[in-house]
Regions:
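N-terminal cap/lid segment of alpha/beta-hydrolase-fold proteins
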Residues: 11-34, 239
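Short beta-strand/loop motif that positions the catalytic acidic residue
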Residues: 261-262, 268-270
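Catalytic active-site module of serine/aspartate enzymes centered on a nucleophile-bearing elbow/loop
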Residues: 292-327
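Conserved alpha/beta-hydrolase "acid-adjacent" motif
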Residues: 250, 275-281
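Conserved acidic catalytic loop of the alpha/beta-hydrolase fold
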Residues: 96-114
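Conserved hydrolase catalytic core segment
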Residues: 112-154
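A catalytic-pocket lid/entrance helix-loop region that shapes and gates access to the active site
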Residues: 137-187
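Conserved HGGG/HGGXW glycine-rich cap/lid loop of the alpha/beta-hydrolase fold
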Residues: 27-86
Length: 327
């Protein structure tokens, strides 16, 4: 990859920073504990931010896409991610567990129905939750759609070299020549190792690859995030775990489930030059869900921090706010 070029900050498009009014650790089972937080209006319309990865975790930046005077904003970290414990753990960590965890959090917070806001893997989990619990959902805002199909996983592991050959070459050549015939299997084996001298170099290589391909014009600070070893290990290990198991979803299951949620308001925001999650997937979802609003951002890739993506997500949430306020 050539030297990263700084893009204008998208922060000016967001709402002011707000601090959590409440937070906690929710026991999910005998092994996993979920970190959660709530900010904004405690009596407001509930909205939950569903982070990507899987394994990505929630960040303070993710509180700022919504008007804190209107929304009761919930952020949380999925199993093995962020401040949930144990970090980077893939035991009892499947899509079905994550759907059940989200429902457990809703019940814990006393929320009847909420808006789902998720991008990338967050869109996958939002759709999986909504199709399992449509009566608990007020609406959806999705970004950079990923449906966890084998074709999408193969694209991530191999196809992105068509656009980012330098980044893919570094990713592949991290492995010895004998292991390059099956990148996913051999990365998964290394990332699953309990030995830090084995799993950490693999995690850094995986995270550098994904970061390099995430934005139309990469930002230097985004490419530096792999300096955080715990975050790099969580996202690499958990992504590889999900990918090797096809996302714990039958191919086509999420699209087939759209019939159960077509009555819900939804906006799909997609970067035209998203290489991580190419527009063909969002297009398929939009065709299966003609009632949804489909917005293609002409000058953006995958990253939520790209100004065009940020702008359209804020607009989408504001439209959802107007819809709920008019009820």
């Amino acid at each position: 990859m050539t030297d990263a070029t700084r893009t204008p900050s998208s922060d000016a498009l967001l709402f002011p920073a707000c601090q959590p009014a409440d937070s906690g650790m929710l026991a999910l089972d005998r092994r996993h504990t979920m970190h959660w937080e709530v900010c904004g209006n405690p009596a407001g319309a509930p909205l939950v931010f569903i982070h990507g990865g899987p394994g990505g975790g929630s960040l303070p930046h993710h509180r700022r896409f919504y008007d804190p005077a209107f929304w009761r904003i919930v952020l949380y970290d999925q199993r093995g991610a962020g401040r949930s414990t144990p970090i980077a753990d893939v035991v009892d960590n499947t899509t079905q567990h994550l759907v059940a965890d989200l429902e457990r959090l809703r019940e814990h917070l006393g929320i009847a129905r909420w808006v789902l806001f998720g991008g990338s893997w967050g869109s996958t989990l939002a759709l999986a939750y909504a199709t399992a619990h449509p009566g608990r959902v007020l609406g959806l805002v999705l970004r950079g759609v990923f449906l966890a199909s084998r074709a999408e996983i193969d694209w991530f592991m191999h196809g992105m070299r068509q656009v980012y050959p330098e980044a893919w070459r570094a990713f592949a050549e991290f492995l010895p020549p004998a292991e390059r015939g099956d990148l996913l299997r051999h990365y998964h084996a290394r990332l699953a190792s309990p030995d830090p001298t084995v799993h950490m170099p693999a995690a850094r290589a995986w995270d550098r690859y994904e970061s390099a391909c995430s934005a139309l014009i990469p930002r230097a600070e985004a490419l530096a995030r792999h300096d955080d070893d715990a975050a790099a290990l969580a996202i690499a290990r958990i992504e590889a775990h999900y990918f090797v198991h096809d996302g714990f979803l039958a191919d086509g299951a999420l699209l087939a489930g759209v019939a159960r949620i077509r009555h819900l308001p939804c906006t799909i925001v997609q970067g035209r030059y998203d290489v991580i999650c190419p527009p063909v997937t969002a297009d398929a979802l939009a065709r299966a869900w003609p009632e949804a609003e489909y917005v293609v951002v002409p000058d953006a890739g995958h990253s939520v921090r790209e100004p065009g993506i940020t702008r359209e997500l804020v607009y989408a949430v504001n439209r959802m706010q107007d819809r709920l306020a008019a009820r």
